[in-house]
Amino acid sequence: MTVTEIFDNQPICIDNGSGFIKAGFAGDDIPKCLFPTCVGRIKHERVMPSSIQKDMFVGSEAQNLRGLLKIQRPIERGIIQNWSDMEEIWSYIYSDQQLNTLPEEHPLLLTEPPLANIRNKEKIAEYFYETLNVPALSFSLQPVLALYASARTTGIVLECGDGLTHSVPIYDGFSIPSAIQQEEIGGRDVTDYLQLQLRKSGHELVSSAEKEIVREIKEKCCYVASDFRSEIESWTEHKPQIHTYQLPDNQTITLGTECFSAPEVLFNPEMMGSEASGLHIQLFKSILLSDIDLRSTLYSNIVLSGGSTLLRGFGERFISELRAISGKKNQVKIYASPERMHNAWLGGSILASLSTFRRLLITSEEYKNDQNVIFRRRF
């Protein structure tokens, strides 16, 4: 296949999240691959022939066999900690079980968080260029792509994922680096706090497989209270709503205040001993750090992105908290797509389908001549 033919092929877009990997072809509305960013290895000794031939599984395969596996997540707080596992995940994306294509036949768009670790970026580029032999590569910021997916060029994006939350103001397509805020708080902290609450209730869910069960409980049962204190008082007096969850062994867990106290850590991180700011305060700081002439525009163009913002009641609580600290004069408007779990991927899909995307690509030849070129081209 010639270089021209390769560049005529659909680019591939990969969004590397701490919680989930999203991957697919440019121009598509939804990612073809959507699976947990995890790897599982057999933790028991094989004593007889079995239909399970492999010792390692990726993503949903690992989740389906989690009782037999030790589950590990290679990305922690936006930084890749286990490179061999992450490389297995990237290789799996191109396999016949997922995209069923060859990496050397498609240009690639990779998303990255703001304030990305430089060493991380170097190693990612090295793997894709030198091991997978991708012909060309471009990096783009996740919040910028999320704004792109909302059909805007100006606004402020709150990107709340599994391990990190960013608030990034963008004006006319340009991010404002001095106003970017990052906090090490996200969906994983909600899961951890829920796990602690369940332990206090007598439910010991401590193994890596059981941690995934806690994550499922969070997604099915948890919600954000519109007023945390009032919700506590109401539940104490009337016990208005009790949730149940059936474990794989058919035991039933009964959940009360845990359903709304766990997500509360996103707005009050001090509950779990963290010094991070609540998400509403984080975004408020970003707006205050932006130029005074831009603030009213940013207040009226807030875009929620990331899977953790899908918690029931999140948007209502967020806008209520932000209005309380920003003052009545500011017109606060929030835009929250139902598909915001993969907003960044969708923005990347749109960007990579444009004819102008070629100008953003760094070819393998350019990379071979100067590896630092990946730091000089920005979206």
From Swiss-Prot:
Cited Pfam families: Actin
GO BP, sorted A to Z: dynein-driven meiotic oscillatory nuclear movement
Cell location: Cytoplasm, Cytoskeleton
A cellular component annotation (GO) from this entry: dynein complex
Family, per entry: Belongs to the actin family. ARP1 subfamily.
Oligomeric and partner information: Self-associates to form an actin-like filament of 8-10 monomers. Component of the dynactin complex.
Function: Core component of the dynactin complex which assists cytoplasmic dynein by increasing its processivity and by regulation of its cargo binding. The dynactin complex is required for the spindle translocation late in anaphase and is involved in a cell wall synthesis checkpoint. Arp1 forms the backbone filament of the dynactin rod structure and serves as the scaffold for the remaining subunits. Required for proper orientation of the mitotic spindle.
Name this polypeptide is given: Centractin
Upper lineage: Eukaryota, Fungi, Dikarya, Ascomycota, Taphrinomycotina
